[in-house]
């Protein structure tokens, strides 16, 4: 079995998820769930530091706990929970950006958002025209886990809804063990909308 590449998640995600869970379920219930977590991750879940970086394994474990304990293995409820966590998280990091943004504008910032909350594995590209965006994730070998695919679609839906107050149509186009392509359709305000392409990858050097 191939070794997974290094990947870390910023603590602000755990803080947002913890705050959201405590608001909905109360301290006692959340503390009970945390006590059922892997011993090595309990301190992360109990008192996450927003600026700290935590291993991908702790994030994957958190997703599993949310799905099994909080959502009771209900995919629709799991996505609703992730949307709530995402809204809290993006409002912490990108509040001013979202307040004045269109769906198209904020989706072009998805690669930047990725680098704000993740480091290590993975690249993100956005291809956009009119009222459609395709967000492609590559070199991130966690997409074989269906929870990561649900996480991604729910997060994109929440980001757009936060800035437009409308839910876009979000659909998985294709995925492999380390890639995922998602199509987002939304209302496009301007009549003319040029083609946009943004990426976490550095631009290619001009050949001589």
Segments from the language model and where they lie:
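Amphipathic interaction/junction segments at domain boundaries or subunit interfaces
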Residues: 48-151
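Short terminal or interdomain "cap/linker" segment that borders an active site or interface and mediates
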Residues: 2-15, 115-150, 163-208
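Short alpha-helical "patches" and their helix-cap loops
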Residues: 27-40, 79-80, 108, 167-177
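N-terminal leader/assembly segments
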Residues: 1-72, 205-208
């Amino acid at each position: 079995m191939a070794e997974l590449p290094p990947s870390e998640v910023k603590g602000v995600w755990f803080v947002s998820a913890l705050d959201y869970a405590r608001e909905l379920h109360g301290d006692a219930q959340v503390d009970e769930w945390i006590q059922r977590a892997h011993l090595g991750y309990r301190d992360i879940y109990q008192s996450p530091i927003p600026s700290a970086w935590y291993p991908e394994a702790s994030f994957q474990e958190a997703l599993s706990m949310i799905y099994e304990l909080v959502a009771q293995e209900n995919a629709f409820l799991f996505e609703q929970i992730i949307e709530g966590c995402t809204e809290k998280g993006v409002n912490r990091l990108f509040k001013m950006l979202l307040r004045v943004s269109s769906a198209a504008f904020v989706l072009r910032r998805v690669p930047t958002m990725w680098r704000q909350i993740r480091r290590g594995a993975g690249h993100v590209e956005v291809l956009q025209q009119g009222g459609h965006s395709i967000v492609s994730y590559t070199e991130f070998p966690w997409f074989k886990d269906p929870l990561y695919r649900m996480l991604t679609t729910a997060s994109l839906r929440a980001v757009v809804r936060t800035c437009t107050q409308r839910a876009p149509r979000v659909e998985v186009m294709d995925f492999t063990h380390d890639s995922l392509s998602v199509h987002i359709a939304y209302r496009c305000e301007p009549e003319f909308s040029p083609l946009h392409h943004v990426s976490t990858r550095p631009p290619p050097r001009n050949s001589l």
